[in-house]
Design a protein with these regions (language model features):
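Acidic, metal/ion-coordinating pockets
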Residues: 1-213
Length: 213
């Protein structure tokens, strides 16, 4: 759910990809970015994934790296330095060209818009959201984001109707209040929001508009 970096002396090796290699050792399948991944700038995010991939075997990590998912983060400026205005038409799950970490400036992260995994006979679709509050902490970033509720509606419908998924999960770095607002705006296609950013533990799942969090 993001914030896999920061908080310990391990952060000194962030751009070397140490935290990502630790996720691989834990056999984490998917992850997304939180605000702390941007603490030393956008380029550091790409550097960490490039170096993790390059140094995996050197550091004795034999499990594959997690798949990075990014679904609502876009390049903020065009080649002329002018701000880019995005609309709902720019939310295109099958098109990596607008994804800043897919085919944009930091494509070497290897990020994808979404992923599909077969689990216990079920077809599970996943995508990822960066929240408004979380992204407000990313002071060094030249990226922008689109509204989580709007992106979630498009991706959830796409994964259910076009990709035939039985279950759709949003990996979120938004915080519970934003996640609840996202859940209330859904149309019955999103099943689960895997919540992060708050760093809180919940004894029981929270259900909003049929979405489990």
């Amino acid at each position: 759910g993001g914030d896999y970096s920061q908080g310990t002396p391990y952060q000194d090796g962030y751009q070397k990809g140490w935290e990502i290699l630790a996720l691989a050792e834990m056999q984490v399948d998917f992850c997304t970015l939180g605000n702390h991944e941007f603490d030393v700038g956008d380029q550091a995010v790409e550097n960490s994934w490039v170096n993790a991939r390059k140094n995996r075997l050197r550091y004795g990590v034999y499990h594959k790296l997690p798949q990075l998912l990014v679904s609502n983060m876009f390049i903020k400026y065009n080649a002329n330095g002018e701000p880019i205005s995005y609309t709902s038409a720019d939310i295109r799950p099958n098109d990596l060209s607008t994804n800043a970490f897919g085919a944009g400036a930091y494509a070497k992260t290897g990020a994808k818009n979404y992923a599909i995994r077969q689990v216990a006979g079920y077809r599970v679709g996943l995508f990822a959201l960066e929240g408004e509050e979380s992204y407000g902490y990313c002071k060094n970033s030249d990226l922008t984001r689109m509204d989580c509720a709007e992106v979630a509606r498009v991706y959830a419908r796409f994964l259910k109707e076009e990709k035939g998924c039985d279950l759709v999960i949003a990996i979120s770095h938004c915080g519970m209040e934003e996640d609840r607002a996202t859940a209330r705006a859904q149309e019955g296609f999103l099943d689960v929001i895997q919540n992060a950013h708050d760093h809180l533990a919940y004894d029981q799942p929270i259900v909003e508009n049929g979405v489990i969090m």
